[in-house]
């Protein structure tokens, strides 16, 4: 049986690739899915619905399109891994963790020790929390 693992969180490091490479070396049967990780593509997801003069409406349309993908992939996953980075506010990661909890999906959180306190509520339902990415 292949595991369907949803990778959520910050997009500014190669943590997803590290996990994929590590589990491939171990021969684990995993299929990975993720939100759109290219920032420009994510921001432009709703552009095919028409050009907007106001960025609010561009963001609104793109977020609606992106949310269809995110919700569907979280609902279909066996487990999620949510990485909270130390840069930028991690709204999407926190929201995805909340969706996992609401949908009854087990999830693992990854984050650095420096942000343990601000994440205490966001990770309170997690099944496992790791301070760093641990690969064999």
Question: What name fits each language-model region?
Answer:
Residues 12, 116-119:
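Catalytic phosphate/metal-binding cores of nucleic-acid and nucleotide-processing enzymes, i.e., regions
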Residues 56-79:
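TIR-domain catalytic/interaction hotspot
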Residues 126-132:
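Conserved small/polar residues in nucleotide/adenosyl-binding loops
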Residues 87-99:
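Conserved TIR/SEFIR loop-to-helix hotspot centered on a Trp-containing motif
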Residues 5-19:
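N-terminal beta1-alpha1 ligand-phosphate binding loop
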Residues 103-107:
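A short helix->loop->beta-strand "cap" motif at the edges of active sites that frequently abuts
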Residues 40-57:
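N-terminal beta-loop-helix "entrance" segment that forms/cooperates
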Residues 29-42:
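A short beta-strand-loop structural module common to alpha/beta enzyme folds
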């Amino acid at each position: 049986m292949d595991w369907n693992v949803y990778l959520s969180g910050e997009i500014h490091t190669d943590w997803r690739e590290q996990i994929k490479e590590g589990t491939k070396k171990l021969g684990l049967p995993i299929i990975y899915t993720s939100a759109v990780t290219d920032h420009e593509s994510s921001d432009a997801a709703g552009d095919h619905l028409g050009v907007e003069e106001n960025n609010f409406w561009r963001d609104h349309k793109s977020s609606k399109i992106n949310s269809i993908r995110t919700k569907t992939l979280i609902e279909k996953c066996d487990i999620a891994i949510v990485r909270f980075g130390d840069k930028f506010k991690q709204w999407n990661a926190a929201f995805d963790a909340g969706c996992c909890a609401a949908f009854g999906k087990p999830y693992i959180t990854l984050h650095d020790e420096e942000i343990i306190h601000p994440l205490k509520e966001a990770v309170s339902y997690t099944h496992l929390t790791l301070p760093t990415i641990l690969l064999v």
